[in-house]
UniProtKB/Swiss-Prot annotation:
The modification Phosphoserine is found at residue 149. GO terms for molecular function: L-lactate dehydrogenase activity; L-malate dehydrogenase (NAD+) activity. InterPro entries: L-lactate/malate_DH (IPR001557), Lactate/malate_DH_C (IPR022383), Lactate/malate_DH_N (IPR001236), Lactate_DH/Glyco_Ohase_4_C (IPR015955), Malate_DH_type3 (IPR011275), NAD(P)-bd_dom_sf (IPR036291). The keyword Oxidoreductase applies. This is Malate dehydrogenase. It is an enzyme of class 1 (oxidoreductase). Belongs to the LDH/MDH superfamily. MDH type 3 family. It comes from the Bacteria. The active site is at residue 180. Keywords: NAD, Oxidoreductase, Phosphoprotein, Tricarboxylic acid cycle. Gene3D superfamilies: Lactate dehydrogenase/glycoside hydrolase, family 4, C-terminal, NAD(P)-binding Rossmann-like Domain. It comes from Halalkalibacterium halodurans (strain ATCC BAA-125 / DSM 18197 / FERM 7344 / JCM 9153 / C-125) (Bacillus halodurans). Its EC number is 1.1.1.37.
Length: 314
């Protein structure tokens, strides 16, 4: 029997989606399909063609297709969802949640129809609630629906620590629990530089400053750009997750996972350390938390549930 080429479909051809498609192609993880709405089919095809024409120079052998038709996504191994709208001035949180939940449902129906065995990674904000929506709509098992936030937050944290210590980012490890921004729970006790606990290398006030900058990381970039938000680091984070699944790497990564009793919580998607491999989220890693970490995580859970309360009722 012929060996099937791997396929990764990216839904949403904006800055993050297009950059994700390019990074997946550069890693030669499989053929790439970039999908957007019919009104954006021209630009989507143009971006995909531009990427495809770069492959001979980069020495990667993949097909890259731009389309508005989900037919091209048939039998995808992994589907990455970046589609959705950003919050606009005057838009309420409930409006944002409701609108993006509607988009998630429409996209998920197409994914289930054309790729019933796919693993789905969700980036669309608010990511915890949107991942939950995709999980419920798809009917897929929890290990095959995964959200992205912690990989990005951890990458930012590692970057800032490496800059502070003037060390290679490769030697910096760290973890965060919970959601993005102020809801992030930094696990400094599990953060190291070359195997040395961070607390042995930096004074507490510098660690606190790095944590705060990490929490505000997305906002810092928004402020500098003036229009738009981060997309290189989010795309790199998504590509890392796709690679972990397709290569069955058994990576220990913080992802948005469905909890069924872990950490004492039920029926919620939230950021926790996981083992990510060929069967998606293969395990949620439960860490012993201090009372302070438990309290901060509980606050993060409360915030996620608050956002989920704005999801349209069935």
């Amino acid at each position: 029997m012929a060996i099937k080429r791997r396929k990764v479909s990216v839904i949403g051809a904006g800055f993050t989606g297009a950059t994700t498609a390019l990074m997946v192609a550069q890693k030669e993880l499989g053929d790439v399909v970039l999908v957007d709405i019919p009104q954006m089919e021209g630009p989507t095809k143009g971006k995909a063609l531009d990427m495809l024409e770069s492959t001979p120079v980069q020495g990667v052998d993949v097909n890259i297709t731009g389309t508005s038709s989900y037919e091209y996504t048939k039998d995808s191994d992994v589907v990455v969802i970046t589609a959705g709208i950003a919050r606009k001035p005057g838009m309420s949180r409930d409006d944002l949640v409701s609108t993006n939940a509607g988009i998630m449902k429409a996209v998920t129906k197409e994914v289930v129809k054309h790729s019933p065995n796919a693993y789905i990674i969700v980036l669309t904000n608010p990511a915890d609630a949107m991942t939950y929506t995709v999980y419920k709509e798809s009917g897929f098992p929890k290990n095959r629906v995964i959200g992205q936030s912690g990989v990005l937050d951890t990458a930012r944290f590692r970057t800032f620590v490496a800059q502070e210590l003037n060390l290679s980012v490769e030697d910096i490890t760290g973890f965060v629990l919970g959601g993005h921004g102020d809801d992030m729970v930094p696990l400094i006790r599990y953060s190291y530089a070359g195997g040395i606990p961070l607390e042995k290398l930096l004074p507490q006030e510098r660690i606190d400053a790095i944590v705060e900058r990490t929490r505000k990381g997305g906002g810092e970039i928004v402020g500098l750009l003036g229009n738009g938000s981060a997309y290189y680091a989010p795309a790199a984070s998504l590509a890392e997750m796709v690679e972990a699944i397709l290569k069955d790497k058994k990576r220990v990564l913080p992802t948005i996972a469905y909890l069924e009793g872990e950490y004492g919580y039920e029926d919620i998607y939230v950021g926790v350390p996981t083992i990510l491999g060929g069967d998606g989220i293969e395990k949620v890693i439960e860490l012993d938390l201090t009372d302070e970490e438990k309290a901060t995580f509980a606050k993060s859970i409360e915030s996620v549930r608050n956002v989920m309360s704005a999801l349209p009722k069935e």
